[in-house]
């Protein structure tokens, strides 16, 4: 499944700055950054649950915001990209 994650973490304190780094790192573990606080991920159900669990452990629900959008399948049919395309095609072969 393709998901889109957006977040807004309060960085007024050092603890908030640390939470922001943790949230970004968890998102990087599962997908790719498309904007400063926006990630696209291609995950299965088990990975999705793990991702959600890890993110919820990072945030402070009293001061932070986290949104996870599940994209309609087939996602490529509904995603339109314009301009510089720096995203990775998760379904394409990986050549090293």
UniProtKB/Swiss-Prot annotation:
InterPro entries: CRISPR_associated_Cas2, Virulence_VapD/CRISPR_Cas2. It comes from the Bacteria. One of its GO terms (molecular function) is RNA endonuclease activity. Keywords: Antiviral defense, Endonuclease, Hydrolase, Magnesium, Metal-binding, Nuclease. Mg(2+) binds at residue 8. GO terms for biological process: defense response to virus; maintenance of CRISPR repeat elements. Its cofactor is Mg(2+). The keyword Signal does not apply. Homodimer, forms a heterotetramer with a Cas1 homodimer. Belongs to the CRISPR-associated endoribonuclease Cas2 protein family. This is CRISPR-associated endoribonuclease Cas2 1. It comes from Moorella thermoacetica (strain ATCC 39073 / JCM 9320). The lineage of its organism: Bacteria, Bacillati, Bacillota, Clostridia, Moorellales.
